[in-house]
Amino acid sequence: MATIPVLPVSDTLKEVKGGCILRTLDRRHFYAVQTPQVFPREVILTAYRQAKRFGTVGTDDAALVEAAGFPVQIIEGERSNIKITYPDDLLYASVFLKSIQHTK
């Protein structure tokens, strides 16, 4: 089965439109998704084929698997599994790595 690691969201989440807050979302129902994500070979291949065929766009592989109709289960992620997306993330990761090296 498709499986992804997640962490409960700790930030307050707001739905915004036109620069104004529409509502505050209940963060108990939201999770931050991590990698690595694990999929049976045929599931991920089918998901990508369908995404190409229908023009489906996803921000991660799991979104494409969901869109293709496959179930995706979650497991508890790890806070130290830092996602590197923006240049500032590299600085944060560097500081984190130095801090754990000093504790060993």
Enumerate the predicted regions with their spans.
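Conserved alpha/beta core of the MobA/IspD/sugar-nucleotide pyrophosphorylase nucleotidyltransferase superfamily
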Residues: 31-104
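Anionic-ligand binding region
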Residues: 1-32, 38
